[in-house]
């Protein structure tokens, strides 16, 4: 079997397990919807993106059912992926998926993002999260995890520019990161507009970030002057 066929087979099996798992891991209930909104949305923005392709170890915070981390792990077996979620039922599901799919390049952690940062500070080449939190909150979680001159990605829809961008701008200096590039793309027959916003870590993250468990969401950094 060709490598590409093997990956496609694993993706099909993964979608089947994801939408049929007894604990709700996704809002999508059909293979078509799951493929477009979860698989394609994870792959399209990074398939030609050097900041991702040149990275060796990658972290996905709030991975849920494995989006995008597990999808990326299937397509990039030469890279290491660390998937983090604070909900034990989701991590248990991922253990099953990884075993069934015979994936060997994934490490699972059942931890809060704030605690995970204590043991994996300045460790990763690339960090991401999807649908976890507003951009300023997500950036506080992710910035401490990557090395200086490494990258952070956020998946966003069109509402990012009207609802979230102002909060993003307010945390860049505080976290020693800079916006690096925006990748815009479309998914599905209805051509839904999607964006991957990439940030570069330009200096050491101050030691007080991330703040203690629960504080980033309760008192978002983007709202603090």
UniProtKB/Swiss-Prot annotation:
Disulfide bonds: none
Binding annotation for S-adenosyl-L-methionine: 62, 113-114, 130
A matching Pfam family: GidB
MF term (GO), any: rRNA (guanine-N7-)-methyltransferase activity
NCBIfam families: rsmG_gidB (TIGR00138)
Gene: rsmG
Cross-referenced HAMAP family: 16SrRNA_methyltr_G (MF_00074)
Source species: Petrotoga mobilis (strain DSM 10674 / SJ95)
Protein name: Ribosomal RNA small subunit methyltransferase G
């Amino acid at each position: 079997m060709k490598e590409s066929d093997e990956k496609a087979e694993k993706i099909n099996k993964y979608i089947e397990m994801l939408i049929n798992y007894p604990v709700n891991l996704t809002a999508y209930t059909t293979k078509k919807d799951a493929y477009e909104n979860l698989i394609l949305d994870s792959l399209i923005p990074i398939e030609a993106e050097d900041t991702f392709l040149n990275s060796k170890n990658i972290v996905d915070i709030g991975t849920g059912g494995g989006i995008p981390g597990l999808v990326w792990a299937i397509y990039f077996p030469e890279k290491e992926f660390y998937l983090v979620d604070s909900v034990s039922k989701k991590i248990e599901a991922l253990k099953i998926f990884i075993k069934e799919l015979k994936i060997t390049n994934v490490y699972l952690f059942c931890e809060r993002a704030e605690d995970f940062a204590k043991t994996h500070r300045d460790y990763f080449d690339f960090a991401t999260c999807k649908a976890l939190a507003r951009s300023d909150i997500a950036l506080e979680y992710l910035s401490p995890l990557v090395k200086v001159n490494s990258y952070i990605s956020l998946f966003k829809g069109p509402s990012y520019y009207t609802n979230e961008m102002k909060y993003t701008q307010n945390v860049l200096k505080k976290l020693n990161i800079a916006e690096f590039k925006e990748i815009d793309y479309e998914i599905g027959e209805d051509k839904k507009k999607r964006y991957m916003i990439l940030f570069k870590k330009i200096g050491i993250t101050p030691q007080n970030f991330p703040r203690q468990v629960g504080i980033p969401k309760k008192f978002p950094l983007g709202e603090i002057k």
